[in-house]
Amino acid sequence: MAGNSIGQLFRVTTFGESHGIALGCIVDGMPPGLALSEDDIQPDLDRRKPGTSKYTTPRREEDKVQILSGVFDGKTTGTSIGMIIKNTDQRSQDYGEIKDRFRPGHADFTYQQKYGLRDYRGGGRSSARETVMRVAAGAIAKKYLREYFGIEVRGYLSQIGEIKIDPQVVADVSKIDWAKVNSNPFFCPDESAVEKFDELIRELKKAGNSIGAKLTIVAEHVPVGLGEPVFDRLDADLAHALMGINAVKAVEIGDGFAVVEQKGTEHRDEMTPEGFCSNHAGGILGGISSGQPIIATIALKPTSSITVVGRSVNLNNEPVDVITKGRHDPCVGIRAVPIAEAMMAIVLLDHLLRFKAQCK
């Protein structure tokens, strides 16, 4: 199975399955000299880990990261950074009934057809459990971007189902209260929406159902010049990385699909000697960063792992009923915020190193 790596100069490779012994990653291309320990990585892992609130899966994993290589005397050496996180709360018996059945909406069918077999225990490699190592690698990238270039990569949840936050709360990204975002389990900047989210998730959990979500990732203080036209555009690589997150079905850069209804006089980001007058482009022009905040929005589908009976087929293509008995999130978008932050940080650091390699 290919496709386990991302990046050129800053390259991340992950391995492991949902119910395996452990998950791990190799980070290549990290410059030497960055002060780094597990304590720098753990906070982001704690934001993502399961079992931390009543709104997410009850599966409990400590998600304690262990650095195996690439760090000496508390600093990166420039060699490959190896990390692992052990699985401790697998309940593989929950998946015995779907061993020969395909869960609708999951990768069960496509994995079986492509490879001739699949790890049915929690989805194996296709499980969002794999993203824990992306967050670990992304935490390293975020630290380097912040300490060496002042770049901040942060995200927030903007919609669950039909409930949306007040757009005025995030109209000026420089004024977003990030402390407020991280103070509630929904990563939501709008206090008035939190209570509505709470009520919705409670209802869904009682019904055994799930719901989709939308979240936004913002990178501030990104310098002008990141991105390689024509096929290595920064926005193209960001879209590729964000679409690679489990359950993501759409990616928008800047105003995204809203540009369809805009006129040229409205959409163009006019300039004055003092700077840009707007940021409809989301901080990227011609595939190259413009120096404005980079803004990307992703939409995540409702998980198909629900306790409502659904129709499917088995390995013999016979009709069967399927119900998922494992422990799952009623809204995967909640825990996706640190994952999306990680993917944006990985792409930005990769492009930053490529920029430094060829430009003054």
UniProtKB/Swiss-Prot annotation:
Protein's job: This reaction introduces a second double bond into the aromatic ring system.
EC number: 4.2.3.5
Family: Belongs to the chorismate synthase family.
Pathway(s): Metabolic intermediate biosynthesis; chorismate biosynthesis; chorismate from D-erythrose 4-phosphate and phosphoenolpyruvate: step 7/7
Top EC class of this enzyme: lyase
Keyword line: Amino-acid biosynthesis, Aromatic amino acid biosynthesis, FAD, Flavoprotein, FMN, Lyase, NADP
Gene (name only): aroC
Pfam families xrefs: Chorismate_synt
Organism per entry: Histophilus somni (strain 2336) (Haemophilus somnus)
HAMAP family assigned: Chorismate_synth
Subunit-structure text: Homotetramer.
Protein name: Chorismate synthase
Recorded superkingdom: Bacteria
Cofactor(s) required, per the database record: FMNH2
GO CC annotation terms, alphabetical: cytosol
Entry's Gene Ontology molecular function annotations: chorismate synthase activity; FMN binding
Chain intervals for the UniProt region annotation (Disordered): 36-60
Positions of NADP(+) binding: 48
Cofactor notes: Reduced FMN (FMNH(2)).
